[in-house]
């Protein structure tokens, strides 16, 4: 949620020539609704089920070349999703401090989980809840709180190259 997954995903895709698969954008396209609408009308559990269905599809129908996948921040909440992500390939956690996340999301009306009385507390709670799950899922962790996006892209590409060269 605001760590740069989509931005970095686009840059890594461009640099590597691998296609970008933005899960949130694909779900919006398939359902014909914005993520915020899905949350409001059908709830978070329904949205998480859509994420799981998409990940299952990707595992069952591998693409060549494999895509760079940008996920939603809560994709790791389901154990099955964590397993599916690792099955799909190299997982990088773009770790950002709660303070930096709040600064990046301060005006984000499109973040349904932050539409609360105290978005800072909500964001901190989500970070505390999700961090161990990100850590469990990721092959590598990059702290991106104070790192320029081009440098993050370069690091992700280098880490992925090393990962895939050892498989």
Report each predicted region and the residues it spans.
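ATP-binding Walker
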Residues: 3
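Walker A/P-loop
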Residues: 6
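NTP-dependent small-molecule kinase module
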Residues: 11, 15, 90, 128-167
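Post-Walker A helix-loop "phosphate-sensing" segment adjacent to the P-loop in P-loop NTPases
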Residues: 14-25
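ATP-dependent small-molecule kinase phosphotransfer cores
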Residues: 23-86, 111, 124
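Short glycine-rich anion-binding loops that position phosphate/pyrophosphate groups of nucleotides
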Residues: 72-75, 97-99, 147
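A glycine- and Lys/Arg-enriched "phosphate-lid" helix/loop adjacent to the NTP-binding pocket
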Residues: 88-132
């Amino acid at each position: 949620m605001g760590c740069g997954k989509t931005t970095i995903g686009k840059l890594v895709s461009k640099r590597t020539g691998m296609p970008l698969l933005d899960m949130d954008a694909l779900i919006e396209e398939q359902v014909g609704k914005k993520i915020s609408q899905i949350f409001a009308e059908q709830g978070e559990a329904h949205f998480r089920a859509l994420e799981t269905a998409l990940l299952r599809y990707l595992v069952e129908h591998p693409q060549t070349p494999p895509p760079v996948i940008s996920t939603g921040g809560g994709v790791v909440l389901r154990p099955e999703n964590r397993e599916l992500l690792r099955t799909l390939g190299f997982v990088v956690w773009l770790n950002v401090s709660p303070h930096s996340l709040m600064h990046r999301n301060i005006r984000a009306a499109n973040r349904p989980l932050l539409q609360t009385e105290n978005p800072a507390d909500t964001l901190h709670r989500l970070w505390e809840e999700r961090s161990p799950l990100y850590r469990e899922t990721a092959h590598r962790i990059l702290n991106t709180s104070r790192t320029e996006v081009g440098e993050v892209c370069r690091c992700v590409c280098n880490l992925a190259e090393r990962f895939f060269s050892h498989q």
